[in-house]
Design a protein with these regions (language model features):
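C-terminal segment of classical bacterial N-terminal signal peptides
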Residues: 17-27
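Short glycine-/Asp-/Thr-/Trp-enriched loop segments that recur within the blades
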Residues: 103-109, 159-164
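Structural motif
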Residues: 76-85, 131-141, 184-195
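Residue-level detector of Asp-centered blade-edge/turn motifs that repeat once per structural unit
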Residues: 60, 118-119
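Bacterial N-terminal signal peptides that target proteins for export
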Residues: 2-12, 20
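Acidic, small-residue rich beta-repeat scaffolds with periodic aromatic anchors
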Residues: 29-57, 71-74, 143-207
Length: 207
């Protein structure tokens, strides 16, 4: 075989090798799942999901913004499996924040639903367990603009749990959620209506 023929053969083999390396099998081309509060069967790359953005909730009057950020603890879950809530002014100053992460990413909480009250005085959000614990329970938290404080909604309804992540406002700051009719009766839900301004005023002072 002549020199030119051998050189041509080497070039052909090199091109074939490059083609086989470029044609990655379809499963490897699948995008890494980065949202949706999902557990993963295998760990995602540590550098994955770096472009995931927070959920931003501007208050109706535009003075405040509530951010729900993914804390990205476990690679065996989407980064939004646990959350951090930050309240900021429209100028970017941080008013307060609250973390719901756990050391290994399986005993914290993620935010399900969130909404400002129509009068912009309260920000309420419901959560679910990152590890699937007590799947019937959806703890709710309330931020008070006047108090600059985040408090559990259950403290405003005699320690009762909230049994649904859904809620709505009936008035400027009157909240309607769901709890149980009697302790332990998970299938017997009843609505509970709370005036958040009155309820916050009755809470003990924070440390």
């Amino acid at each position: 075989m002549g020199l030119d023929m051998r050189f041509a053969l080497v070039i052909c083999l090199a091109i074939a090798g490059l083609s086989s390396a470029t044609l990655v099998p379809a499963p490897a081309l699948a995008e890494v799942v980065c949202s949706g509060h999902k557990l993963l069967s295998s760990p995602r790359p540590e550098s994955s999901c770096s472009s995931l953005k927070p959920r931003i909730y501007p208050s109706p009057d535009g003075a405040l913004r509530a951010l729900v950020l993914p804390v990205d603890v476990s690679l065996y879950a989407t980064p939004d499996m646990e959350s951090r809530v930050v309240i900021r002014t429209s100028n970017g100053d941080t008013v307060t924040s609250k973390d719901y992460l756990s050391p290994r990413g399986t005993n914290g909480y993620y935010v399900v639903n969130a909404k400002w009250s129509p009068d912009s005085q309260f920000f309420l959000y419901s959560m679910a367990s990152s590890g699937g614990h007590s799947p019937w329970s959806f703890p709710m938290m309330v931020y008070s603009r006047e108090k600059k404080r985040i408090a559990p909604f259950s403290d405003m309804i005699d320690g009762k749990p909230t049994l649904s992540a859904d809620f709505h406002f009936d008035g400027a700051h009157r909240l309607v959620a769901e709890t149980w009719k009697a302790p332990g009766s998970l299938d017997d839900k009843v609505p509970v209506t709370v005036d958040l301004e009155d309820a916050f005023g009755k809470l003990p002072a924070s440390d």
